[in-house]
Amino acid sequence: MNQPCNSMEPRVMDDDMLKLAVGDQGPQEEAGQLAKQEGILFKDVLSLQLDFRNILRIDNLWQFENLRKLQLDNNIIEKIEGLENLAHLVWLDLSFNNIETIEGLDTLVNLEDLSLFNNRISKIDSLDALV
């Protein structure tokens, strides 16, 4: 089985990674080309897919204030952090990571679907605010 993550260095989410992901996942036809030329505003992005990127830390997502779906599965994330500004998030996938504590989710009051399977969870914290 091909597993490209093992050969890559651990990565932190930076502007370049996010711009590349947004560009790759945006519309590919003429409208998409226009958006790439003019620059896509992160606040306009509703869905972001960052799976299989060897991400070690969640970071630089504060600009995605209207994000509704975030896919961070199959990385090497150890801690749930950097999500406090994503109040509109409805769907979050953090499965297949190295997370030990469920934390940092208390501001995600619209969260409906949270996937955390296949992690190293031993402690659950700060879920009281969530319905």
Enumerate the language-model features and the residues they cover:
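The feature captures the LRR N-terminal capping module
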Residues: 1-78, 85-93, 113, 122
